[in-house]
Amino acid sequence: MKKSLLLFFVLINCLNALTFEEVYTIQKNEGSMKALSGYKQLAQENDPKAIHELAIIYLTGDEIAKNINKAHELFKKASELGNADSTYFLAKIYLSDKTIYFDEKKAYNTFVDAANQNNAKAQLMIGRFFLMGGIVPKDYEKALHYFKLASKQKEYDANCYIAYMYASGTGVFPNFGRANTFAKDEYEKGNKLCVKVWNDYNLGKYPKDEGFRIGDYNEPVK
């Protein structure tokens, strides 16, 4: 009799279980508090997307108290389960000197892990590290490589950095026309970084790329 009841309740729970997509829809339509129990249930089942969303809720304090420690724990768990977005957020926590987890070396290594998982935002960050130096020595060739990887995934801030490198001749031969090509769309959208590069180097005067078409990425993905 007891076994029958146990099997009955297990069956009921299975029938009532929500998918990640269903819980995510609840969150978007009714708020994070309504979705919390669903995410927690899925997290117990090691659903990496649910664990990631739960971590975001704790990180931002979306309808609950902020809890950086819980967010860190959850991002780490989801990252270990292969969620590249969680790996990126984990790296951001390590990069913040406002947390007890601040560790620039660990931040860099974790961003690299996320970049290797094809996370575009992490690729952008690694590009910035190599462009600016500090955490790692400056390496303009690597910076451009990572900016291009991010740009190919439509991480549009990367186009502004590529434009800057071509306009300033940082690590590449100066090419104002190519800088124009990479900056133009984001400049027109009001992206502050691209606006600065556009104005600083007067890129409106150079509408055509007159340079040699070397390499496989001479204009941005739209």
Can you name each region flagged by the protein language model?
Residues 39-42, 78, 113-114, 149-150, ...:
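Canonical positions in the second alpha-helix
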Residues 174, 178-222:
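Terminal, low-structured helical/coil segments at or just beyond the last alpha-helical repeat
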Residues 85, 89-99, 105, 109-116, ...:
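Alpha-helical adaptor scaffolds
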Residues 22, 26, 53-60, 64, ...:
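Hydrophobic face of amphipathic alpha-helices that form TPR/SEL1-like repeat modules
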Residues 31, 44-47, 60-62, 81-83, ...:
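Short helix-capping/linker turns of helical repeat alpha-solenoids
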Residues 28-37, 65-74, 100-110, 137-146, ...:
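Structural signature of tandem alpha-helical TPR/SEL1-like repeats
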Residues 4-13:
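Sec-dependent N-terminal signal peptides
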Residues 15-53, 214, 222:
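N-terminal leader/linker segments that initiate helical-solenoid repeat arrays
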